Each structure stands twice: as C-alpha cells, then as structure tokens.
Amino acid sequence: MPRVACIANPNARDGKLGKNFHKIEEALGSSGIEYDVFMTEGTGHAIEIASGLRDSDYDLVVAIGGDGTVHEVANGIRGSSKRLGIIPMGNGDDFARAIGIPLKDIQGAIDLLNGGSDYTVGGIRVEGLRAPEHPGIPSPKHYPVTGDPSKEGNLVRWSFLECDGGVTSSINRMKDEGHFSWISGQKKYTFLAIKAILTWKSQMAWIKVDDQPGHKVDLTGLFALMQAETFGGGYRVAPGMHPFGDSASIVLGFGLSKSQMLRVMGPLEKGKHVGRWGKISKDSCRSFEIRALDPEGNPTDEEGHDPPLFISLDGEISMTTPVRFEFHEGQLHVRGGPSPPNRR
C-alpha cells in the first residue's frame, strides 16, 4: 500500500469538505492506505505544504479539494519526483476529470491512489503582475518553488488545467466573493457566467500567439489557454483536448456581443462553439502574450489595464496584465484512471 500525504482544503465546495472530512478519513482507513493529513489555512498554503514534501518519503502527495487546491499542490511539487494524486471535492474538478479520476465517488478516487495509472503532463509557466488585494482576498504571494520572475514585482505560477481572462475571470472573482454559494457544480458556474456577462464592460488589449504578429482585440468574449477539454465544471471549452500532448490549445472568441455570449453558453457546454459567427477559434499554442494599450493605443509592458484585467490560472485569480504564458512538456507526475478522456 502507498504512503500518502493528503493536503486538504476545508473550504472546498463552499466549506462542505471541512464538515464532511471524516467520511474521507474513514474511506482512507478502510482502504488500508497509510496517510497523513495537512489542512490548509488559506490561499497559497497548499503550495507551502507541498513544496516542503518534495524530498519526503511519501509515495503520493494527494490534493483533496477542487481545481484550486490541485493547482497549489501541483505548483509545490512540479519538477520533482513526487507524484500527484487527487480526491476531487470541488465545484469544478476539471483536472481530475481530465486524468480519468471519477467525480462524486470518494471510494473510486481512493482506489486509484493504490491501483491507478501513472502519467506525466506538461505545464504552462505564467508570469505577470500579481493581482492586487481585494476585500477579503489577499494579493498572491511569491513562492521560490515556482521559479524567479524576470521582472521585479511580477509573479510566477504554473498552470496545469487552463488559463483565462476577461469575462471568465470575472466569474472566478465572483466565485471567490461567495456569489451563489448555495449552488454547486456546473450549475454554479452557469449562474456566475450569466451575471458576469451582463455586468461586463469592454476592454481593449494586444495579444500575440506563438510567432504570429501581435494584434489588438476587443476582450468582450473569451480567451482560454487549455490543457484539458473542460473547465467550469464540465464546459467543453477545448473539444478533444487532453493534458498529455506537446502543446496547449488556445480558444479565442473576441468582439462578441452580450447576446452572443449568452447564446454561446449552450454550445460551449457541448463543445459546439468553435467556428460560431466566424469569431471563435481553437488552435494549438505554446506561447501567448497579452498586454494593455497605452494612451496612444500601443501595447505596453510597463503597466496593466485600468481597471485591472484579471487572469485566472486553474480557476484561481493570480495576475493582471501584462502576462506571458509558455508551455513546457514533462512538468508534473500524476496518478489517474486507466482511460482518461481523449487520450489516444
């Protein structure tokens, strides 16, 4: 039996995990797995805990929570020999879904800790201005384990599920603020998305994909750099994508009206949005940049958007513009199910 370190977020699933954690402990105990539990106490704490386990003798470092908890634990052990396990207990759980871990099945997820399949996935190094403080939400801290930024004041994080900005990051900000906390799963993200769309105010930006020429865009719509097919609790944002390849996938849909954004939610859930209105595209991508425009309308790396354009990494608001994203292969060892979706 493996010896595992469990890093659990008691606030996951709007606090339900903390109230029901005894059920997970009972299931772990009955499975014969030797385990230790480390409870997180706030944003970033799972990175600290996980980074301290890089040289430990645990067979697995297990994230118990949602995609945000997975994001932090993965940042803490990325680049080491440690392997990530997951017991999904969040609202989205899209990374667990992407590596074949069953959702809403605690025993099924625990069984995979012992008898699952091992994989290695890529990661996206993201560097940008750290997001400012928000009422009740501190500005993200720098952790040495994620690597040094190229510019003072910047933040570095690694993403393993998705990176997004604009309207979709407004969704994550409202989630952090506790909107619709009585709703869980995909339905929660649907309500949040409707509210975010109706309150969104247009912003312009400059973007550059790989070696293509940079150009200006109206951010009314979406952009997402994806390493899995879904986020937001199952929305098929990048149909056919999986985290085992040699690049990410970028989904761009700019200049959409609010009516179009509302009408695309149904197709987005089913993965039928690409090509719609001639405005939504999906392509492979290894690097991406986004910057604000200066008063003369030129891209600038000296300052960000005003108001800030938030960038979410794996569902966690971390940065504001200017931001650079770079895909790197072979960054994280994971344990998942025998048949992850879309893996050939």
Task: Map each language-model feature to its residues.
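Glycine-rich beta-strand-to-loop/alpha-helix junction loops that act as flexible
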Residues: 10, 64-66, 87-90
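Catalytic core of DAGKc-family lipid kinases
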Residues: 31, 79-83, 87-222
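Short Gly/Thr/Asp-enriched flexible loops that form oxyanion-binding sites at enzyme active sites
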Residues: 69-82
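Glycine-rich phosphate/pyrophosphate-binding beta-alpha loops
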Residues: 164, 168, 224-238, 317
